[in-house]
């Protein structure tokens, strides 16, 4: 259930009954401090200003109309007109019970939408590197959350699978195959690309051949398309290994590369010209946008077709947005692309809106993110200053986690150790990223991310096993407590219960804003509240069986919420650590 939404509706009704306009904002928020209750309604001040009333006077009138019977046991006015709401322990107990009876932990489904999520987007014939990590895992956490809430999600892996570099790559692949080393060379994609580029730069005959191959490929020649597909297939097979290691839900079926939109490009250029949006300028086809000014203060020109007839990324992105609305029937489109692409996307979407390709009712959202930095505050690199391959990063995560786990569990079997190292190591890399606000840069630090204290994956995974251990110690099957009532008598029980019931609100924020760090913060807070509850409210040595069973149920809902919350982030859990 969504308590915030329920209270917003109630406060809104009371505001309207007190004379506020029908579109007033109740501004119900979770309280920052326990002494201000569980929720605060902060909308009175703004409404009082509009009505020319003293805020406190309006707050008193709102209170006289506010019916929170069975929901809150105390409502008070604080300061100039804040309304503090304290939830009724009986309401908390009832909803904890309901959450435990539902596989979805009481989370309701909003009206389902078709949502296209564009994420990961590596390039063909290049290995994935750390620069692909953020888009891949933040996008995937968003996808998992939206799917859990019941939306139809279409994953779009906008792979860089087209462009002039393919002439060079096909020419080099052909050369390698003639020397019977094709497969071997492509096992090292990075080396393959580097060698192809070297030949292109140093051998004029090779470069000439490469340029002619581009023309043939773009003309749809079957032989060159076959060679191109080979490059795409080998790259995506290697990428799939990385996706599987990362526990990311992308598959080969989700690839929607740049090449998909090629057939649309001539028609789009012709249509933009016909609509008077695109004009010829110095031989190129350009759209001038009043919304963006150049250094001279004139409308900025966005090229959609070059002098030589070639198309640009902008043209592809216009086609891409059009396709996602017209063919995929998207109600909403999310792009997980780094912040440096912001202006480029905004310009493409401005053209899309002007051309009427996607209506204003369908949001196109750039969920941008910052960079991953080394401890020196500069972009994360190898010691030699090169780009860090994602596969190498995951290998190191596994190795470090293996050492850490072996140290803490010297008697663990080799298989168990390997599995635990994988869960902890990969989880640590992902959680370190997901727990930071995506809009900011963050410092990649092995020691911090593998620590068993603080807001880290190992701490969260351990917190989950710690809650489960209560049931092992009790020797109780969770189903045996189905009929036991939940009774909230202590403050710490109430605080834990209220936070558990804010799970749906947290999911809603992640779904709306694309900010998985909000879920990480919620789960970390929940683990801390459980710790305090466990310390001050004895479970197994409780004074009565009723209290013991009630507290076991709070522990059970905590375990289920931690597991499900981590699952929406793509972080695995184990039952023992």
Curated annotation (Swiss-Prot):
What is an annotated GO biological process for this record, any one?
arginyl-tRNA aminoacylation
Keyword presence, Cytoplasm: yes
GO function terms (MF aspect): arginine-tRNA ligase activity; ATP binding
Query: Matching Pfam families, A to Z?
Result: Arg_tRNA_synt_N, DALR_1, tRNA-synt_1d
Q: What is its EC number?
A: 6.1.1.19
Keyword check for Phosphoprotein: no
- Renumbered to this chain, motif 'HIGH' region spans 122-132
UniProt xrefs under CDD domains: Anticodon_Ia_Arg, ArgRS_core
**Keyword annotations from UniProtKB, A to Z:** Aminoacyl-tRNA synthetase, ATP-binding, Cytoplasm, Ligase, Nucleotide-binding, Protein biosynthesis
Q: Name one GO cellular component term.
A: cytoplasm
Q: Kindly state which reaction or reactions the protein catalyses.
A: tRNA(Arg) + L-arginine + ATP = L-arginyl-tRNA(Arg) + AMP + diphosphate
Q: What is its main location?
A: cytoplasm
SUPFAM superfamilies, per the entry: Anticodon-binding domain of a subclass of class I aminoacyl-tRNA synthetases, Arginyl-tRNA synthetase (ArgRS), N-terminal 'additional' domain, Nucleotidylyl transferase
Q: Which InterPro entries match?
A: aa-tRNA-synth_I_CS, Arg-tRNA-ligase, Arg-tRNA-synth_N, Arg-tRNA-synth_N_sf, ArgRS_core, DALR_anticod-bd, Rossmann-like_a/b/a_fold, tRNAsynth_Ia_anticodon-bd
Residue ranges that the Swiss-Prot or TrEMBL entry lists as coiled coil: none
Quaternary structure (record): Monomer.
| Protein family membership | Belongs to the class-I aminoacyl-tRNA synthetase family.
Record-linked HAMAP family: Arg_tRNA_synth (MF_00123)
Q: What is this protein called?
A: Arginine--tRNA ligase
């Amino acid at each position: 259930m969504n308590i915030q939404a329920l209270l917003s509706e109630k406060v809104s009704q009371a505001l309207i009954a007190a004379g506020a306009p029908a579109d007033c904002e109740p501004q119900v928020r979770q309280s920052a401090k326990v002494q201000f209750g569980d929720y605060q309604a902060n909308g009175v001040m703004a409404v009082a200003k509009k009505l020319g009333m003293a805020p406190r006077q309006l707050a008193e009138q709102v209170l006289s109309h506010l019916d929170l019977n069975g929901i809150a046991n105390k409502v008070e006015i604080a300061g100039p007109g804040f309304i503090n709401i304290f939830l009724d322990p009986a309401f908390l107990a009832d909803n904890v019970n309901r959450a435990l009876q539902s596989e979805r932990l009481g989370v309701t489904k909003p009206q389902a939408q078709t949502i296209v999520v564009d994420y990961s987007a590596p390039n063909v014939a290049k290995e994935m590197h750390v620069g692909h990590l953020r888009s891949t895992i933040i996008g995937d956490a968003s996808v998992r959350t939206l799917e859990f809430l019941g939306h139809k999600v279409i994953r779009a892996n906008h792979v860089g699978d087209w462009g002039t570099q393919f002439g060079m790559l096909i020419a080099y692949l052909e050369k390698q195959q003639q020397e019977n080393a094709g497969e071997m060379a492509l096992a090292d994609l990075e080396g393959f690309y580097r060698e192809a580029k070297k030949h292109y730069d140093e051998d004029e005959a090779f470069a000439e051949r490469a340029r002619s191959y581009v023309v043939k490929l773009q003309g749809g020649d079957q032989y060159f398309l076959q060679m191109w597909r080979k490059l795409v297939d080998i790259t995506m097979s290697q990428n799939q290994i990385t996706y599987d290691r990362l526990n990311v839900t992308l598959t080969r079926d989700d690839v929607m590369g740049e090449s998909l939109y090629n057939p649309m490009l001539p028609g789009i250029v012709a249509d933009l010209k016909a609509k008077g949006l695109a004009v010829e300028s110095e031989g190129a086809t350009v759209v001038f946008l009043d919304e963006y000014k150049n250094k001279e203060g004139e409308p900025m020109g966005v090229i959609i077709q070059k002098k030589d007839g070639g198309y640009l990324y902008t043209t592809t992105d216009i086609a891409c947005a059009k396709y996602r609305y017209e063919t995929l029937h998207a109600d909403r489109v999310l792009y997980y692309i780094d912040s440096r692409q912001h202006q480029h996307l905004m310009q493409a979407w401005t053209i899309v809106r002007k051309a009427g390709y996607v209506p204003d009712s369908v949001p196109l959202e750039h969920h941008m993110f910052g960079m991953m930095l080394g401890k020196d505050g500069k972009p994360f690199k190898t010691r030699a200053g090169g780009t860090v391959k994602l596969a190498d990063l995951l290998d190191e995560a596994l190795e470090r986690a293996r050492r850490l786990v072996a140290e803490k569990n010297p008697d663990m079997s080799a298989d168990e150790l390997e599995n635990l190292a994988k869960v902890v190591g990969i989880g640590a890399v992902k959680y370190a990223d997901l727990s930071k606000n995506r809009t900011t840069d963050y410092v990649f630090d092995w020691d911090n991310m593998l620590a068993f204290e603080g807001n880290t994956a190992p701490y969260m995974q351990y917190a989950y096993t710690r809650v489960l251990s209560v049931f092992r110690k009790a020797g109780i099957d969770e189903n045996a407590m189905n009929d036991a009532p939940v009774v909230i008598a202590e403050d710490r029980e109430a605080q834990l219960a209220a936070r558990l019931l804010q799970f749906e609100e947290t999911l809603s924020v992640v779904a709306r804003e694309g900010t998985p760090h909000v879920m990480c913060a919620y789960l970390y807070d929940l683990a801390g509240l459980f710790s305090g509850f466990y310390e001050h409210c004895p479970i197994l040595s409780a004074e009565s069986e009723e209290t013991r069973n009630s507290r076991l149920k709070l522990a059970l809902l905590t375990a289920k919420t931690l597991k499900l919350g981590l699952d929406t982030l793509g972080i695995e859990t184990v039952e023992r650590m």
